[in-house]
UniProtKB/Swiss-Prot annotation:
GO terms for molecular function: DNA binding; DNA-binding transcription factor activity; sequence-specific DNA binding. SMART domains: FH. GO terms for cellular component: nucleus. One of its GO terms (biological process) is positive regulation of DNA-templated transcription. Residues 54-148 bind DNA. Residues 13-22, 286-306 have a biased composition (Low complexity). Probable transcription factor. Required for smooth muscle (visceral mesoderm) differentiation during gut development. Also required for normal proliferation of the lateral plate mesoderm. Acts as a downstream mediator of bmp4-signaling. Residues 1-51, 236-255, 283-306 are annotated as: Disordered. This is Forkhead box protein F1. It comes from the Eukaryota. It is found in: Nucleus. Keywords: Developmental protein, Differentiation, DNA-binding, Nucleus, Transcription, Transcription regulation. The keyword Transcription regulation applies.
Amino acid sequence: MTAEIQQPPSQPPAQSSPMSAATDKHGGQPSVMESANCATKTKKTNAGIRRPEKPPYSYIALIVMAIQSSPTKRLTLSEIYQFLQSRFPFFRGSYQGWKNSVRHNLSLNECFIKLPKGLGRPGKGHYWTIDPASEFMFEEGSFRRRPRGFRRKCQALKPMYSMMNGLGFNHIPETYSFQGASGTIACPPNSLSLDSGIGMMNGHLPSNVDGMGLSGHPVSHIAANGGHSYMGSCTGSSGGDYSHHDSGSPLLGGGGVMEPHSVYSSPASAWAPSASTPYIKQQPLSPCNSAANPLSSSLSSHSLDQSYLHQNSHNTASELQGIPRYHSQSPSMNDRKEFVFSFNAMASSSMHSGSGSYYHQQVGYQDIKPCVM
């Protein structure tokens, strides 16, 4: 009995040894699992850490900043890398893709020039500098983005802008400008020709435009030979009456040549001085000789047996119905009306051009009309 009673306590140690070993094994497994979990946690924490923010500049601006920081205004590729890494924390991390961006911007952008490598210079790599023609993009530290060829396009468009600004009707060209120093109005003949730009308007304007006139400010009647003289030479006078034009004018004696009236020979309420007397009606012009001028039959609409004002009023009443009358205008507005209508009159009169002999006769004569300043 005693032996049977003593055996059970001896068995538990034998049984306890495998259990203890099992518990040791189970206790060792959690330690390995914990180490693996800790490793994954550290990886997750490392992956969750965000790298520094990228600088708020483009790569072009960063490269320019690096090159401008050098006293010689030139750097190699490795020196540009060093400048960016020392200046911005973003380029110090494990991410190395920014180096490719720097290389691509250096080689593909026209703002940077690769300088030839000097003789006897150790190492490899070329110096990079900024193109002098592109320095305006980065002046005063403002790194502004500009498309390729921006400067060349601006320089190419400058002449066109200046030409467009000079073609406004607010400015009369120099050939028709007022000469205030001498007190006269310069009206040089043959300054505008239909062959050099107005001839392309032939056939597009009605023939009755040359008789167009506004009330109180009639437009001059241009000669019907093609209008190679814009207006006769006009001299300004301080005041007084308009002189009569008698039929015995020496300009009308040979060949039946029509005299081109100047634009500024017509009366204007804004130009006429207060001390001057009203306009005196002109004498009727002498009719053209039909034998000397073969074009007299085709110029029925431009008959010379009527006075200047009578013909102007007749054309205005019969052909220009519905056109408003401008009774009071400023001198600048009158200038514009005369300038535009004179072009129309020249274009319409070019349709009546004929032989070359008639052209030579017209060029030889100039009509001198007194004008009121």
